[in-house]
Amino acid sequence: MTIILGIDPGSRVTGYGLIKESDRKIAYIDSGCIRTSNDVELSHKLLQIYDGICELMDHYSPTEVAIEQIFMHNNPNSALKLGHARGVAMVAAASHRAKICEYSAREIKQSVVGYGAAEKDQVSHMVVELLQLNRAPQKDAADALAIAICHSHMRNGLSKLIGSRGTKRRRMRL
């Protein structure tokens, strides 16, 4: 069994989603949001994110962490803040010796919905379906669960399927 933590980083709200994978089947463990205080400086917000991720790592002991890659914002200041939040989340996971993988928004949508330009509500719907949830989680938590699901799909990708079948190489006849 593998426990995967998906992280949707943000300087105000960082979503997290935990799933377990066993025999190529996934199941929901937990999800939620780490909300930072509005009235503190960026450095203290980053510490809150770090502490929140460390708490999740200590409590659930995931061995693999998946996080969304940065995409270019129209506002460079927002992109920098997102980069900081992403960085401290990665450091928190790395300090617990977890394997960390990064995925683009397009890869996540393609893996979960089957369409790389899917809308957020389509992703949320598929998260509910794939994890057999009674209702949709909070927006940032649903995104984090989608990231974890994407990682599960990618780690069990085509190359592993081909390798597990024990296919033999055949010599091509001319």
Curated annotation (Swiss-Prot):
One of its GO terms (molecular function) is magnesium ion binding. It comes from the Bacteria. It comes from Legionella pneumophila (strain Paris). It is an enzyme of class 3 (hydrolase). The RuvA-RuvB-RuvC complex processes Holliday junction (HJ) DNA during genetic recombination and DNA repair. Endonuclease that resolves HJ intermediates. Cleaves cruciform DNA by making single-stranded nicks across the HJ at symmetrical positions within the homologous arms, yielding a 5'-phosphate and a 3'-hydroxyl group; requires a central core of homology in the junction. The consensus cleavage sequence is 5'-(A/T)TT(C/G)-3'. Cleavage occurs on the 3'-side of the TT dinucleotide at the point of strand exchange. Binds 2 Mg(2+) ion per subunit. The lineage of its organism: Bacteria, Pseudomonadati, Pseudomonadota, Gammaproteobacteria, Legionellales. Its EC number is 3.1.21.10. This is Crossover junction endodeoxyribonuclease RuvC. PANTHER family: CROSSOVER JUNCTION ENDODEOXYRIBONUCLEASE RUVC (PTHR30194:SF3).
